[in-house]
Design a protein with these regions (language model features):
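Membrane-embedded segments
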Residues: 4-6, 10, 18-22
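Solvent-exposed coil/turn segments that connect beta secondary-structure elements
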Residues: 14, 38-40, 79, 156, ...
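Short, basic, helix/turn surface patches
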Residues: 14-17, 21, 67-70, 104, ...
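Active-site environment of divalent metal-dependent phosphoester hydrolases
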Residues: 16-18, 81-83, 132-138, 158-161
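A short acidic, amphipathic alpha-helical/loop segment
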Residues: 21-25, 138-142
């Protein structure tokens, strides 16, 4: 059962700071949180002995520990589409790319990420977190085709529990140094 005004705490990219800083706070306060790691980053850092909190990403072992606690769950943030360059912005279609090629690329990426979660002892994610918050109708169609039942974007708005679709859920970004009271006031 949810409180009258529930707050969902989410983290994108799967930074190691989720494990080092957020996980102890979740344990201390009994809070539940969501992290959406980029699966290729977790794959990479699981194979390295590099755990620098300033730049490293969550390993599969760390995610299993966090998931087992019941305080964290993990959602899909793509396998390797968290890029912002001249060729592509996140999961958006490139200029000149055919719809068939775009669909093939997305489905392969989403399925590879989903498989890695399961292969590494985690539940298959049910939510897709858009890299950079970038989305469009075609992308949403493919997200649904892959079986996701919710998406997290970056549009700042309050979500209401209505029983309606859980696609395009809004969130409020809290950059470093930003007073949490400002976000809570925005969400009123």
């Amino acid at each position: 059962e949810l409180p009258e005004k529930p707050i969902m705490i989410t983290f994108d990219d799967g930074n190691r700071s989720d494990y080092v800083y957020a996980f102890p706070l979740a344990k201390k306060y009994g809070m539940k949180m969501i992290s959406s790691p980029v699966a290729s980053y977790s794959e990479q850092y699981s194979a390295l002995d590099d755990h620098n909190v300033d730049y490293a990403h969550l390993t599969w072992a760390e995610m299993r520990e966090m998931q087992t606690s019941g305080l964290f769950e993990f959602q899909n943030h793509s396998y390797d589409l968290h890029r912002f360059d001249v060729n592509r912005k996140g999961c958006l279609k490139r200029r000149g790319e055919t719809e068939a090629s775009y669909r093939s690329l997305l489905l392969a990426d989403f399925e590879k990420s989903q498989a890695l979660f399961v292969e590494n002892g985690l539940p298959a994610p049910i939510c897709f977190t858009y890299p950079f918050g970038s989305t469009n109708a075609l992308l949403l169609q493919y997200v649904k085709e892959c079986g996701f039942s919710a998406t997290l974007g970056t549009y700042e708005h309050v979500n209401h529990l209505t029983g309606d679709s859980l696609f395009d859920l809004g969130r409020f970004n809290r950059p470093h140094g930003y007073d949490i009271r400002r976000i809570l006031n925005q969400a009123e």
